[in-house]
Amino acid sequence: LYVPHNNEKEDVVSPRTRVTLTDISRQSGYSPATVSMILSGRTDVSFSADTVRKVREPAEALGYAPTAKKRPSLFDRKTVLIVCPNVLNPYYSTIVQAIQQAAADKDCDTLVYTTYRDAENEIRILNAVAGSDLAGVVFTMMPQSTELVERVNRLVPVVVIGDRNTSLNVDTVEMNNYSAGAIIAHYMIGLGHKHIAYISTTLNEANSARVRRLEGVRDTYRDECPEGSVIVRSREVTPKEERDNISIEHAVGFELTRKCLGERRITAFVAVNDMVAYGVLDAIRAEGRRVPEDYSVCGFDNIFPSQFLPVGLTTVEHYIADKGRNAFEILHSKMSGESSDRNITRVEFKHHLIVRDSTAAPRGEEKTG
């Protein structure tokens, strides 16, 4: 797998005049990876007689001639690439491990590539995938280069785990982050919190899940608590910071919360994810305040440390491991030819609120519903 250097410009491999695996893929409806395995006579994978026929017939009709046998490839087994922004946040490391467990059950190998949310890194790895022998790709976040992802998906099966997005024409495992934000807001309003702070790392459309969560919180407060307010505090995190600072999410939560503690009307904090929420918790404690007696704190994701004592974190369950396993199952069905490449699968996981000890009614107030 060759990844070009920063100063190299690449695009997906252009069509050639001879009949290619891609030509047969278009005719048969199966991925180039599936076509390649059938036409090369791979013995470590099996396909139904009908699938083999649907690949061999267009190959013969088009006059496909295989190239000379290549030297052994690093990816002679079915190898899947996992693309993620980082592996420090347990949300991503849990997804990665779940994919690897599911892949091992199918005798597949995995590679992991971290982008640190850098669009150039994403483009480089996608172009490298287009010219590789990889069997499939799983994105653990919404890609920034959606058009390129769709083009690569014509060559290599791609599955994306991320925010609900009906405009992305690849297989997806989704969560409705707008609804997740609304659930937390409704709960906080019910506790009696009229003025809350939303604490986040970079807020932009490249990080759509964060924005959708905020929109869900804001809209719910506007509709259910018009006398209340959502105070937004965010800080941009560069790809270099995400790569070099292993505690950047905690640091952002800590820094922004300390700036909010002087605002007397704020009684609760909603963090964009659980890692940021830990920074919020530590900032409150550093100022000699208590959770939930003085401030309530919520997060999103339900990463595994969120249940730990002394204060369990109220958060939204995102079924992290289940999403990883499901994404690989969808990918494997494309890799093995069990599912047609012409079909797009969308799976949406329903979330729910997990209430723990980090939230309570504001001091002196009773829960309203």
Task: Give each language-model segment a name.
Residues 1-30:
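Extreme N-terminal segment that seeds HTH/winged-HTH DNA-binding domains in transcriptional regulators
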Residues 34-37, 72-87, 195-203:
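Short beta-strand segments enriched in small/hydrophobic residues
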Residues 184-228, 343-358:
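An alpha-beta-alpha
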Residues 256-369:
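Flexible loop/turn connectors
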